[in-house]
């Protein structure tokens, strides 16, 4: 599966937030946006704002691809209910993101590696597809050998149980978590490292499909 291999710190500086949850905050060394004229903020057009919100959402979930955005929008646009919520849920409930939210990895990129390398189980069966959609009631756990990985033990040691989203449950001792219910829009938004206008993104994608 294709993945982003570009400069992550540059993206964090662009949006002014430690968006990937890295231990070393890249903004402490270089707080300004990248580029020769990083301090200068030009007024953006509506189209420019839509593009920026789209890029923010991609970054929040580990640099997801454009085609994944389009596919997710197509899957929810004709369904009854809150399109923005259903659209955002498509990314919040990705397996790699759930692994990250549970605290099995310190960053979304580390979570992606855990999944891709076959360390993660869904209802007791190995799933190595990062974009796998986790549904309520599904249990996420780690292989017994994988539980001794340094990236896992260090992350769980620092995981504050109070920071766990209300739609998840976690048994640290068993290295097991569960998606209890489908997350609401406001619950998902509170977990993002920076505010994202999902409605603007949906409006942008409506002209692309």
Curated annotation (Swiss-Prot):
Residues 93-154 form the S4 RNA-binding domain. Coiled coil: none annotated. GO terms for cellular component: small ribosomal subunit. It comes from the Bacteria. The keyword rRNA-binding applies. It holds the Pfam family Ribosomal_S4. One of its GO terms (molecular function) is rRNA binding. The keyword Ribosomal protein applies. Residues 22-45 are annotated as: Disordered. Gene3D superfamilies: Ribosomal Protein S4 Delta 41, Chain A, domain 1, RNA-binding S4 domain. Transmembrane segments: none annotated. GO terms for biological process: ribosomal small subunit biogenesis; translation. Disulfide bonds: none annotated. Belongs to the universal ribosomal protein uS4 family. Part of the 30S ribosomal subunit. Contacts protein S5. The interaction surface between S4 and S5 is involved in control of translational fidelity. One of the primary rRNA binding proteins, it binds directly to 16S rRNA where it nucleates assembly of the body of the 30S subunit. With S5 and S12 plays an important role in translational accuracy. This is Small ribosomal subunit protein uS4. It comes from Chlamydia muridarum (strain MoPn / Nigg). The gene is rpsD.
């Amino acid at each position: 599966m294709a993945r982003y291999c570009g400069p992550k710190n540059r993206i964090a500086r662009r949006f002014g937030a430690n968006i990937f949850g890295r231990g070393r905050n890249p903004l402490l060394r270089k707080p300004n946006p990248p580029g020769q004229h990083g301090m200068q903020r030009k007024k953006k057009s509506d189209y420019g704002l839509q593009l920026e919100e789209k890029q923010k959402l991609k970054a929040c979930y580990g640099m997801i691809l454009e085609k994944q955005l389009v596919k997710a929008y197509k899957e929810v646009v004709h369904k009854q209910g809150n399109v923005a919520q259903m659209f955002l849920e498509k990314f919040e409930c990705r397996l790699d993101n759930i692994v990250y939210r549970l605290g099995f990895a310190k960053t979304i990129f580390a979570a992606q590696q855990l999944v891709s390398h076959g360390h993660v189980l869904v209802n007791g069966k190995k799933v190595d597809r990062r974009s796998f959609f986790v549904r309520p009631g599904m249990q996420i756990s780690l292989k017994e050998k994988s539980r001794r990985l340094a990236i896992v033990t260090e992350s769980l040691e620092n995981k504050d149980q109070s920071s766990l989203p209300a739609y998840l449950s976690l048994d640290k001792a068993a290295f097991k978590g569960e998606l209890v219910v489908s997350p609401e829009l406001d619950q998902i938004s509170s977990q993002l490292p920076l505010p994202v206008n999902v409605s603007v993104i949906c409006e942008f994608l409506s002209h692309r499909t």
